[in-house]
Swiss-Prot record:
Gene (UniProt): RPL15
Official protein name in the record: Large ribosomal subunit protein uL15c
Cellular component terms per the entry's GO annotation: chloroplast; cytosolic large ribosomal subunit
Region (Disordered): 1-21, 66-120
Major localization listed first in the record, in broad terms: plastid
């Protein structure tokens, strides 16, 4: 023990003194034996490795061009890629992690304040709550339908534009229908769309006179087809299922109004 802790006038070497923390010990530090089982924490070791290997990227924005250069002092050039994107230091602030109790270092209230609704237990205040007054989302006027946020719903037609019909290469006088478009490979409906009818839209121009049959036409498409001399045929829709009792009532109503029209016509002739 005396040999280990013997005082010496020789100053400690700077090379070995860097490996030990500063202390008030005045002896010869070279006599200490290094403990081979004294390892640094794994988390600290990994953090040092990441600091050595990582290079911070600085995006230099200019009016003419944008350059990406590594930070000052880094020897290796690192490319600016999607896998090394990240926010600038200090641009994103971490939320305050509120503890529980005095040991958290935030006092007895733990960062929630003294009293009030926000300091109590539970989920807190619901989103949009304004203290009891009429909230903003209920004060604004209501919009119905798609403008108010409702879904547009499932598609009701298989749409096709005039430019697609022009590219298909139909000859003059040929018939354009859902079957002919399928045969030419212009449309290939699958799943639920196989039972949907055809609708013609007006994007593009058509220079050939054709016989077009579809369930529906947009306004611009109908105008362009009539201007080009095409024949437009609106196909009837699928018959809606009606109960037998409702069908009898409708037939009775049609019969009643037919008699009424005939009576009014006879009165007009006699007058």
């Amino acid at each position: 023990m005396a040999s280990l802790l013997s005082l010496s006038s020789t100053p400690p070497s700077t090379a070995n003194s860097n490996n030990y923390p500063s202390s008030t010990f005045k002896g010869n530090i070279n006599n200490f034996r290094i403990n081979p089982f004294n390892f640094a924490p794994l988390k600290l070791h990994l953090r040092n490795i990441v600091k050595k290997e990582s290079t911070r990227l600085v995006v230099v924005a200019s009016a003419s061009s944008s350059n990406v250069s590594p930070s000052i002092g880094s020897g290796s050039e690192t490319r600016f890629r999607l896998d090394n994107l990240g926010p600038q230091p200090g641009s994103r602030k971490k939320g305050k992690r509120k503890g529980r109790g005095h040991a958290a270092g935030q006092g007895g209230s733990c960062g929630f304040g003294m009293r009030g609704q926000k300091s109590r237990s539970g989920p807190g205040i619901m989103r949009g709550f304004e203290g009891g007054q009429m909230p903003l989302y209920r004060r604004i006027p209501k919009l119905r339908g798609i403008a108010g946020g409702m879904r547009a719903g499932l598609p009701k037609y298989v749409p096709i534009n005039l430019r697609d019909i022009e590219v298909a290469g139909f000859k003059e006088g040929e018939e354009v229908s859902l079957e002919s478009l399928k045969a030419k490979g212009i449309i290939n409906p699958s799943g639920r769309e196989r039972r949907l009818p055809l609708k013609i839209l007006g994007e593009g121009e058509l220079s050939t006179k054709l016989q077009i049959k579809a369930r529906a036409f947009s306004g611009s498409a109908k105008e362009k087809l009539e201007a080009a001399g095409c024949s437009v045929t609106v196909l009837p829709g699928r018959k809606k299922y009606i109960k037998e009792s409702v069908r009898k009532n409708l037939a009775r109503a049609d019969e009643y109004f037919a008699k009424k029209r005939a009576a009014s016509a006879s009165e007009a002739e006699s007058a």
